[in-house]
UniProtKB/Swiss-Prot annotation:
Function according to Swiss-Prot or TrEMBL: Part of the sfmACDHF fimbrial operon. Could contribute to adhesion to various surfaces in specific environmental niches. Increases adhesion to eukaryotic T24 bladder epithelial cells in the absence of fim genes. Probably involved in the export and assembly of fimbrial subunits across the outer membrane.
Full protein name: Outer membrane usher protein SfmD
Main subcellular location: membrane
Entries under PANTHER family matching the protein: OUTER MEMBRANE USHER PROTEIN, OUTER MEMBRANE USHER PROTEIN SFMD
Listed InterPro entries: Fimb_usher (IPR000015), Fimbrial_membr_usher_CS (IPR018030), FimD_plug_dom (IPR042186), PapC-like_C (IPR025949), PapC-like_C_sf (IPR043142), PapC_N (IPR025885), PapC_N_sf (IPR037224)
Record gene name: sfmD
Annotated localization: Cell outer membrane
Gene Ontology BP annotations: pilus assembly
Expression induction: Expression is negatively regulated by H-NS and subjected to cAMP receptor protein (CRP)-mediated catabolite repression.
UniProt membrane topology term: Multi-pass membrane protein
Family, similarity comment: Belongs to the fimbrial export usher family.
UniProtKB keywords: Cell outer membrane, Disulfide bond, Fimbrium biogenesis, Membrane, Signal, Transmembrane, Transmembrane beta strand, Transport
Gene3D superfamilies: 2.60.40.2070, 2.60.40.3110, 3.10.20.410, Outer membrane usher protein FimD, plug domain
Species: Escherichia coli (strain K12)
Disulfide bridge positions per record: 840-862
Length: 867
C-alpha cells in the first residue's frame, strides 16, 4: 500500500502547488505539535463550511495504517527491502514517522537477527502478529521516515544473534525468472584481398535454480585462393546452486578448481564449495582479533589506514572472527576506546596466501569425468579429483587432495599458516605415479612453497612468491593425457596456412624440475611505484628453460601519467623468443589547456597518448594519438593515431566504439605502407522472458531484468549506455551474486507522462540467475483540475480518487486537484465527509497533447451520484 503524498510530485512541478494546498496548510505546523489539536476551519478559509472534515489531521502528521514497502536498516546496516505492516500509534517513533509503528512478527524478528529466546516477553508473544519491540527489548529504538520509506532499528549488540557482517539469509536469495538467454559477438575484417569473420555465442535457458548453457564459435576465412570455415562447440553444461551445502553443481563441460592442483578441463560432474555464498566477512582468511576491554568500549580495526571494522564490545575478553580485510596484506591496527576516556592500541600482523581459511571454515571440491582439452595432442582419460581445505585454531589451515585415473595417481597434503610479522606461508607435498604415452612408468614427488608478506612501512608488497621443486619422476595429470612423448600444437589461420603458429610444445622426456614465481610491488610514494612479475621454469635433462618476466615503473606528474616497462619471454621448443622495452605517456587535454576538469565537457574527457617500443631484434615502433569519449552518457569512445615502424614504415589507425542500449558497435580503419584494412564488431545480448524479448549490451553471468511498464527511454543509474526500451524493459549486466544489488531509475530522464512510485529496487541473485526488478510506474498526464459543484469549488481538504487507476490526491485552494499518471479521460470521486451528501463525482477529458505537456490545467464539474 502506498498513499501518495507531496513527495510523489516531481520537484520540477511543485510550483503548481504553491498557493494551492500548501499556502493554506502553512499555518498548520504550529497546531500539529500538540496531540489531539482542534482545527478551526475558519482559520483556513473565511467560509469554514467550505472546508472538508479535518478530524484526520487533529492528531498531527498521521498517515493511514497499512502495509508499506520500506528499506529496513539495523544498527546502520542495510538488511533489505520488505513489506511491513504498520499500525497507528501515539508512541515516539520519530518526527517523520507519520504516527506509525511497525508490527513485528517472528519472521521479521529473525530477519533482523534478534535473539528472541533471551527475552521472555517475546517468547510469550511468539504467536502475536504485531509484537511491540520497544516494550519487549530494553534500549531498542525505532525511527521511521515515512517520506523516505526507511525504517531504522537500533538494537543492543547483546540482543542479537551471532552472525557475520554482511550476512544475507538464503530466504532472500532470488533464483530468478524463467528465461532464454543469448550472448553474441560478431567481428569481421576486410583488407588486402582477404575476408575473415568470427562469431561466438553463449546461449542458455534458466528454469528455477537450473541453468543450461552452451558456448560455441564459428570461423570463416577467404583469400589468396583459399577458403576455410569451421564451427567449434566449446562447451555445454548444466549448473545449479545447492544452497544447504553452500555449493554449486556443474554437469557437463567445465574446469576443475585450482586451489590445490592445477586446473584442468573436464566433461563430467563437479560439486564444489561456493565462496560467493558466504558473507564477505567469512571469505578467504583473516586473523582472529582478541583483546580485553576494561569497560563498555568501541572497537575499531584499521588496515592500511582504512577502517574495516567497528563495533561495540562489553567489558571483558572479546573475540572477533568475521573480519573482511580490504586486501590480502597489511597489518591490522586495533583501537579500543574505553568509556572512561582511556585507549588501547596494538597491531596484529597480517598476510595471506590463497589457501588460508578462517578457523572453522571447510571447503571441498569434487570432480569426476573425462579429461577435456582444446589441445589435439591430448586424449580424454576418465579421472576423479577431490580436494579439501579446513581452517584450524592458531591460524593454521590444513589441506589435501587426490587425483585418480587409469594411468595416474596423485596425493597431496599441505599446511599453511599466518606467521604474523613474518607474513603468511604454505607448504605442501605431492606424490604421483604415472604411465606416459610410451608406456613407461614413473614415480616422483613435488614440493611447493608459497609466501606472501606486506611491509607497509617500506611500501613493499610480496603479493605472492612461490617455489616448486619436483623430482625427475614427477608428472601431472595434464602430462599423462598426451598421446605422444613429444609434439607441437599449431594454430592455422587461412592467410598463412603454410606457416602455422606454434601455440604449444611438449616433451615428456624433459619433466619439470623447479619453478620460481614472483609478484612484488614497491611504492615510491609521490614518485610512483615499481613492480616485478614473472616465472622461471627449469626441466630435467635439458639446460633450456621457460622464462617470463615483466618489470615496470609507473608514475604521474601534474595529471600526466607515464610508465616504462620491460618484458622477457622465452619458451622451450618455441622460436622467436623476444625482449621488449616500452614507454607509454597519457596527457589529459585539460592539462594542456590549463582548464579545470569538468566531466560534462568532451574536451576535458579527451587525452593525448604516445607509446614507443623496441624489441631484441632492433625493431622500433612509435605511435602518437588522441582519444576520449563523446555523447551525454560518455558511451562513445574514439581513438586516432599515427606512427612509424621499422618493418612497415608509416602506420595509423582510427577506431570508435559505441555502447548502445541494445548492444555494442565498434569499427576501425588501419593502414601502413603495404596494406589497408577495415574491421568491425557487433556484440550484444538477447533475453526472452514471459513479457517478451529484451535486447541488451553483452550479458554477464548474472543479470537483472528491469521492468518499468510504459517507461521507455529511462536511463539506469551507474550503467553506461543502458536505458529502457519502448516498453519500459532493460537489462542491468554483471549483477553481484548473493549480494544486494541496487537498481535505480534516473528520474531526470523520465518523460512528462511517466511517474514511478519508487525509483530504487534491490535484489539478491543466485549464480547465473536473471532476476526481475519491478518498478510501479504510472503512465499518464500530470494535471491540475479545478473541481466545482454547483458553481462553487468543492471543499478544501477533500479526498480525491480517480476511479479507473486508483490515483488519490487532495483538494487545495479554490477546488484545485493535482494528479499524476492520470488517464486522458476519467472519473474523480471527491469526498469531504462520511455522509452520502458529502461526496460527488466529476468526469473530465484531457486533450491528447497533454501527454507532451509538463502540467495540463482544466476544469471539471462535480455532481452527486445518481443526479
Amino acid at each position: 500500500m502506498k498513499i501518495p503524498t507531496t513527495t510523489d510530485i516531481p520537484q520540477r512541478y511543485t510550483w503548481c502547488l504553491a498557493g494551492i494546498c500548501y499556502s493554506s496548510l502553512a499555518i498548520l505546523p504550529s497546531f500539529l505539535s500538540y496531540a489531539e489539536s482542534y482545527f478551526n476551519p475558519a482559520f483556513l478559509l473565511e467560509n469554514g463550511t467550505s472546508v472538508a472534515d479535518l478530524s484526520r489531521f487533529e492528531r498531527g502528521n498521521h498517515q493511514p495504517a497499512g502495509v508499506y514497502r520500506v528499506d529496513l536498516w539495523r544498527n546502520d546496516e542495510f538488511i533489505g527491502s520488505q513489506d511491513i505492516v504498520f499500525e497507528s500509534t501515539t508512541e515516539n517513533t520519530g518526527d517523520k514517522s507519520g504516527g506509525l509503528m511497525p508490527c513485528f512478527n517472528q519472521v521479521l524478528l529473525e530477519r533482523i537477527g534478534l535473539n528472541s529466546s533471551a527475552f521472555p516477553e517475546l517468547a510469550q508473544q511468539q504467536n502475536n502478529k504485531c509484537i511491540n519491540l520497544l516494550k519487549a527489548v530494553p534500549d531498542a529504538t525505532i525511527n521511521f521516515d515515512f517520506a523516505a520509506m526507511r525504517l531504522n532499528i537500533t538494537i543492543p549488540q547483546i540482543a542479537l544473534l551471532s552472525s557475520a557482517h554482511g550476512y544475507i539469509p538464503p530466504e532472500e536469495w532470488d533464483e530468478g525468472i524463467p528465461a532464454l538467454l543469448l550472448n553474441y559477438n560478431f567481428t569481421g575484417n576486410r583488407g588486402n584481398g582477404n575476408d575473415s569473420y568470427f562469431f561466438s555465442e553463449l546461449s542458455g535457458i534458466n528454469i528455477g535454480p537450473w541453468r543450461l548453457r552452451n558456448n560455441g564459435s564459428w570461423n570463416y576465412f577467404r583469400g589468396n585462393g583459399y577458403h576455410s570455415e569451421q564451427w567449434n562447440n566449446i562447451g555445454t553444461w548444466v549448473q545449479r546452486a545447492i544452497i544447504p551445502l553452500k555449493s554449486e553443481l556443474v554437469m557437463g563441460d567445465g574446469n576443475t578448481g585450482s586451489d590445490i592442483f592445477d586446473g584442468v578441463g573436464f566433461r563430467g560432474v563437479r560439486l564444489y564449495s561456493s565462496d560467493n555464498m558466504y558473507p564477505d566477512s567469512q571469505q578467504g582468511f583473516a586473523p582472529t582479533v582478541r583483546g580485553i576491554a576494561r569497560t563498555a568500549a568501541q572497537l575499531t580495526i584499521r588496515q592500511n589506514g582504512f577502517i574495516i571494522y567497528q563495533s561495540y564490545v562489553s567489558p571483558g575478553a572479546f573475540e572477533i572472527t568475521d573480519l573482511h580485510p580490504t586486501s590480502s596484506n597489511g597489518d591490522l591496527d586495533v583501537t579500543i576506546d574505553e568509556r572512561d576516556g582511556n585507549q588501547q592500541n596494538y597491531t596484529i600482523p597480517y598476510s595471506t596466501v590463497p589457501i588460508l581459511q578462517r578457523e572453522g571454515r571447510f571447503k571441498f571440491d569434487l570432480t569426476a569425468g573425462d579429461f577435456r582439452s582444446g589441445n589435439s595432442q591430448q586424449s580424454s582419460p576418465f579421472f576423479f579429483q577431490g580436494t579439501a581445505l579446513g581452517g584450524l585454531p592458531q591460524e593454521f589451515t590444513a589441506y589435501g587432495g587426490t587425483q585418480l585415473s587409469a594411468n595416474y595417481t596423485a596425493f597431496l597434503l599441505g599446511l599453511g599458516r599466518n606467521l604474523g610479522n613474518w607474513g603468511a606461508v604454505s607448504l605442501d607435498v605431492t606424490h604421483a605415479r604415472s604411465q606416459l604415452a610410451d608406456a613407461s612408468r614413473h614415480e616422483g614427488d613435488s614440493i611447493r612453497f608459497l609466501y606472501a608478506k606486506s611491509m607497509n612501512t617500506f611500501g613493499t608488497n610480496f603479493q605472492l612468491m612461490g617455489y616448486r621443486y619436483s623430482t625427475q619422476g614427477f608428472y601431472t595429470l595434464d602430462d599423462v593425457a598426451y598421446r605422444r612423448m613429444e609434439g607441437y600444437e599449431y594454430d592455422y589461420d587461412g592467410e598463412h596456412r603454410d606457416e602455422p603458429i606454434i601455440v604449444n610444445y611438449h616433451n615428456l622426456r624433459f619433466s619439470r624440475k623447479d619453478r620460481l614465481q614472483l609478484n612484488v610491488s614497491q611504492s615510491l610514494n609521490d614518485f610512483g611505484s615499481l613492480y616485478i612479475s614473472g616465472t622461471h621454469q627449469k626441466y630435467w635433462n635439458t639446460s633450456d628453460s621457460d622464462t617470463w618476466y615483466q618489470v615496470g615503473y609507473t608514475s604521474s606528474w601534474v595529471g600526466i601519467s607515464y610508465s616504462l616497462s620491460f618484458s622477457w619471454n622465452e619458451s622451450v621448443g618455441i622460436p622467436d623468443n623476444e625482449r621488449i622495452v616500452g614507454l607509454n605517456v597519457s596527457v589529459p587535454f585539460n592539462v594542456l589547456t590549463k582548464r579545470r576538469y569538468t566531466r560534462e565537457n568532451a574536451l576535458d574527457r579527451a587525452y593525448a597518448s604516445f607509446n614507443a617500443n623496441r624489441n631484441s631484434n632492433g625493431q622500433n615502433s612509435w605511435l602518437a594519438g588522441v582519444g576520449g569519449t563523446l555523447l551525454e552518457g560518455h558511451n562513445l569512445s574514439y581513438h586516432v593515431s599515427q606512427g612509424d615502424t621499422s618493418n612497415n614504415g608509416y602506420t595509423g589507425s582510427a577506431t570508435a566504439n559505441w555502447q548502445a542500449a541494445y548492444g555494442t558497435l565498434g569499427g576501425g580503419y588501419n593502414y601502413d605502407r603495404d596494406q589497408h584494412d577495415v574491421n568491425w564488431q557487433l556484440s550484444g545480448g538477447v533475453v526472452g522472458h514471459e513479457n517478451g524479448i529484451t535486447l541488451s549490451q553483452p550479458l554477464g553471468d548474472t543479470n537483472v531484468l528491469i521492468k518499468a511498464p510504459g517507461a521507455g527511454g529511462v536511463r539506469i543509474e551507474n550503467q553506461t549506455g543502458i536505458l529502457t526500451d519502448w516498453r519500459g524493459y532493460a537489462v542491468m549486466l554483471y549483477a553481484t551474486v548473493y549480494r544486494y544489488n541496487r537498481i535505480a531509475l534516473d528520474t531526470n530522464t523520465m518523460g512528462n507522462s511517466i511517474d514511478v512510485e519508487k525509483n530504487i529496487s534491490s535484489v539478491v541473485p543466485t549464480q547465473g540467475a536473471l532476476v526481475r526488478a519491478n518498478f510501479d510506474t504510472r503512465i499518464g498526464v500530470r494535471a491540475l483540475i479545478t473541481v466545482t459543484q454547483g458553481g462553487k469549488p468543492v471543499p478544501f481538504g477533500s479526498l480525491v480518487r480517480e476511479n479507473s487507476t486508483g490515483i488519490t490526491s487532495m483538494v487545495g485552494d479554490d477546488g484545485q486537484v493535482y494528479l499524476s499518471g492520470a488517464p486522458l479521460s476519467g472519473e474523480l470521486l471527491v469526498q469531504w465527509g462520511d455522509g452520502a451528501n458529502s461526496r460527488c463525482i466529476a468526469h473530465y477529458v484531457l486533450p491528447k497533447q497533454s501527454l507532451q505537456q509538463a502540467v495540463t490545467v482544466i476544469s471539471a464539474v462535480c455532481t452527486h451520484p445518481g443526479s
